[in-house]
Amino acid sequence: MASVAWAVLKVLLLLPTQTWSPVGAGNPPDCDAPLASALPRSSFSSSSELSSSHGPGFSRLNRRDGAGGWTPLVSNKYQWLQIDLGERMEVTAVATQGGYGSSDWVTSYLLMFSDGGRNWKQYRREESIWGFPGNTNADSVVHYRLQPPFEARFLRFLPLAWNPRGRIGMRIEVYGCAYKSEVVYFDGQSALLYRLDKKPLKPIRDVISLKFKAMQSNGILLHREGQHGNHITLELIKGKLVFFLNSGNAKLPSTIAPVTLTLGSLLDDQHWHSVLIELLDTQVNFTVDKHTHHFQAKGDSSYLDLNFEISFGGIPTPGRSRAFRRKSFHGCLENLYYNGVDVTELAKKHKPQILMMGNVSFSCPQPQTVPVTFLSSRSYLALPGNSGEDKVSVTFQFRTWNRAGHLLFGELRRGSGSFVLFLKDGKLKLSLFQPGQSPRNVTAGAGLNDGQWHSVSFSAKWSHMNVVVDDDTAVQPLVAVLIDSGDTYYFGGCLDNSSGSGCKSPLGGFQGCLRLITIGDKAVDPILVQQGALGSFRDLQIDSCGITDRCLPSYCEHGGECSQSWDTFSCDCLGTGYTGETCHSSLYEQSCEAHKHRGNPSGLYYIDADGSGPLGPFLVYCNMTADAAWTVVQHGGPDAVTLRGAPSGHPRSAVSFAYAAGAGQLRSAVNLAERCEQRLALRCGTARRPDSRDGTPLSWWVGRTNETHTSWGGSLPDAQKCTCGLEGNCIDSQYYCNCDAGRNEWTSDTIVLSQKEHLPVTQIVMTDAGRPHSEAAYTLGPLLCRGDQSFWNSASFNTETSYLHFPAFHGELTADVCFFFKTTVSSGVFMENLGITDFIRIELRAPTEVTFSFDVGNGPCEVTVQSPTPFNDNQWHHVRAERNVKGASLQVDQLPQKMQPAPADGHVRLQLNSQLFIGGTATRQRGFLGCIRSLQLNGVALDLEERATVTPGVEPGCAGHCSTYGHLCRNGGRCREKRRGVTCDCAFSAYDGPFCSNEISAYFATGSSMTYHFQEHYTLSENSSSLVSSLHRDVTLTREMITLSFRTTRTPSLLLYVSSFYEEYLSVILANNGSLQIRYKLDRHQNPDAFTFDFKNMADGQLHQVKINREEAVVMVEVNQSTKKQVILSSGTEFNAVKSLILGKVLEAAGADPDTRRAATSGFTGCLSAVRFGRAAPLKAALRPSGPSRVTVRGHVAPMARCAAGAASGSPARELAPRLAGGAGRSGPADEGEPLVNADRRDSAVIGGVIAVVIFILLCITAIAIRIYQQRKLRKENESKVSKKEEC
């Protein structure tokens, strides 16, 4: 088989490289539709036009409107015609035509393409051929198929040659089709971890295909490793792609030597590059773009024997592979496939196989640059000088990667000499040549070839020559000499020697970018240069490198590092806890309350209490309860402090308590909370009270403001009472603290410090008035804060003219606004703040549009988010708007963020001076009707409720949160409204916890069982007739929903058994081969319906989920949330007189089939969780009893945290709670079952219970016999009279 695959591969490799694309090889057969003909005129643009009838909008192929094509004002090779396809398309061919009925046509041209209209890339034919053949007349069409095709949104046609007897004239068409693009963006600190489906045999073939666009020159693209050091890694290193392959331990005879394959160059150019990796046994094929490296490994294919996970974008676990602990990838991956699986699609759908780490998004940002580029060493720009002046003065900025190159040459008048400015070894050097004298040289700067912009100022006058590079100034004194400025300055290179200019560039011309050129006091206008109105040039491309130094001053916040790119500055937010263009937005929620309402369970979390404010995030423990979210901040003090007697007046103890968070962070968190407390547990033996008898404080504590407090507990300041004194239950009513009594015994006080304006405690000082034998000990607990008073702070706006007003918003350089809203109206203004000319406004402009508009002096700017569904659905929607010096962004809910870049060199400060209006405007028009909640400006929360209480037309608070947050209540839990938030009612769920998501699991030892009784228990004092009557209370079902999860290695096993008083039953078992079997017997006169589901061997020690849904005769079975199967019952549709549900071993399965009896005898050994039959949850009823017990337990059943985290099934499990059978302290299985609430009886009580149960069973047998007889008779008379009830 491998030889056949290799033969096929060899055939493919013999094909021309132009006909095979590594990613998505081969074009669709119909990918040749015209793309430009249907575009509007606005989609066409050009460098210039001869007249309005020669505009780019008339450049469609075979069209005759206008003048019959596009013709620029001037015919030269710097003209261009551009098309915007509207979105990225796959382009497979182009066609050109001359101007209709004219002598204007192009004979050759260049084709460039771009994703975003900037950062153009030139299409190359056959690697080295750049130009395309054009037309020979005005009417014929020249069609060219692109091999290989490419994907782009923008295309540019650059004429190189044209009819010498005419002008440039073009009509064009572009062919292709829609392009499927699944994009994932990594910001340099993120990764995707893809867990593969485990297979019993290692694969003989692995195929990985992707495209990538690199924003940086280094980074891990993918990594996969095994148990013995074997790994494969694809890494971008200095713009080259390196594939590392290591089979592991070199001492093993079968391993191969490490392999390193390198392909590609300049792959960090922010353009797409394709990669294909094929591991075919020992054959390795590594393809980048059109270049393929074949490698035949010696030895076996042990490098394929890797773990069942692969990471993209980085190595997610630091230190996991020390040899490859490298920088993560910064850029985009497109159409990422592993063995045919679309990994990006799985990540978008949040499939369980994918783990996203860090800031991973699914859109690829496009660079925007307007550069001025010197294309070759022959490039030059000649500009007129200030002829006749007695000085030379030139300033400019440059950017380059070259260590050497000519920058500037000028010749002085009257033969007085010349000067040349050039780069050598990354340093700037200036040489002045004068007749009869040695050259005068000046050197300034270092490392100027770092790709950054550097400013240069050169001046020469009578007695000195001065060069300033950035902040490095170099001065060269001159002998008094006449400096007479020349006529022309040459930047970047020189004219041909035949021109007689005298310009020389022995180190070669400059390759890079120039900007901000001034000669004398006059700035050079680049637009005039482009239009040919100023100077002359060669091989100069304008609009290719026009950036300024935007990192001085740095607008990066929160310690973010500023770095340059082609068109703007960027902030490296790695390790800051913030994100965004300026590291302004926090990565973390502001409180545990916010974490809770994102569905997060209890655990350690970072919180950022002031949001985008100056305070950083810090780590806390969030304790999520059903009623609230508690923030727990631990201190670093001792667990317990012990005190012993000392002479009078001497300090007994002064202990300081430090916290992981700073004072400002703690203050912000405490102020945000609804209430906070800290508990002090005090134990004392013959110790003194906290104060002397004359009232002098002997003990005190210090809060966060460094103030001393003598109040203990929740009392008023200086009340000097412990908690027992406040509650009036001290052991001695004469005192206000238990320790005041001074008894010769150990007593205790629990002190709750709850004045949150003073918390947390930073120091406790305790002294004593002189009891040598006294002793005490105290423990200070963590800081506990409940809730978030800003998260639910809200106001309801009832009239269009109503609003709340606050002081003006001060956000000059950075302004962010975030809030929740809900409404039923179609429009309204959320907030508005005005200045003299500046303003900021956020509004609901239409039912599906939210708009953020502002003006900082550059003219009004708008950012709009459109939704496919209306926002006026009376549910909470979250809005976040940000405006900074780089632009503006707006995001609503989880919709894609919309951004608007700021204009270059425009105004950056937002100056506002009016009041801030919330819910309306200053003109009282277009007011908002609805609710606004949790409004924050630059991280500062506004108290809406306080203002609403005194504002007509506005009410504090909002109702109706379950419509938005009800989805947090999982697994059948019901959302219940609270005044401030919601809570989940788990009464009818098999789970518990704040979101009904905590698994209730139990380990069943061999021979154990748990029985849930659907009928109520009746005492033996009732007469037999009443007992029989009670058994007539049927539970008859025509439908039921059953869910359970399990893990075991034993077969056969009984997972669940539901019995009936009529010998009807349902059994769910694992057969001897581990297959799932379900049997329904709904008519005791017929054989049961038996169904086998050969999904897999489910007795494999792994966790499996089973869901059974019956609707009369239709049964739907779902396994592991994926595999589904539907079956039809033939034995009936009614489950009559349901008696009990049994988990584990069944002592007697009367009337059951042989397979069910065998499984019932074997029982179940392993872990069961989330068991639910209709509304009955037997595990929950046993482990979380909330009323009279319906559960009986036999044998050893131990609760477990989670089945997935438990011990291997089939092995003894460590019991996590007292055993649920036989009574505490006894060993061995119980002989008979008993209600769970009586599990702790003494032995005599147990014996009595056993006797009672035996008697009860005998009575049940008699009653059942009577019941069967009566039921037969009843069915014969009228079967329709059988009572029915709803699902239990």
UniProtKB/Swiss-Prot annotation:
Keywords: Cell adhesion, Cell membrane, Disulfide bond, EGF-like domain, Glycoprotein, Membrane, Repeat, Secreted, Signal, Transmembrane, Transmembrane helix. Pfam families: EGF, F5_F8_type_C, Laminin_G_2. Residues 551-583, 962-996 form the EGF-like domain. Residues 1215-1236 are annotated as: Disordered. Residues 31-177 form the F5/8 type C domain. GO terms for cellular component: extracellular region; membrane; plasma membrane. Residues 584-792 form the Fibrinogen C-terminal domain. Glycans are attached at N285, N359, N441, N497, N623, N706, N1023, N1073, N1120. The keyword Secreted applies. Residues 183-364, 370-545, 793-958, 1015-1203 form the Laminin G-like domain. Residues 1267-1288 are cytoplasmic. Residues 26-1245 are extracellular. Residues 1-25 form the signal peptide. Disulfide bonds join C31-C177, C332-C364, C513-C545, C551-C562, C556-C571, C573-C583, C931-C958, C962-C975, C969-C984, C986-C996, C1167-C1203. Belongs to the neurexin family. The chain crosses the membrane at residues 1246-1266. The keyword Aminoacyl-tRNA synthetase does not apply. This is Contactin-associated protein-like 3. GO terms for biological process: cell adhesion; cell recognition.
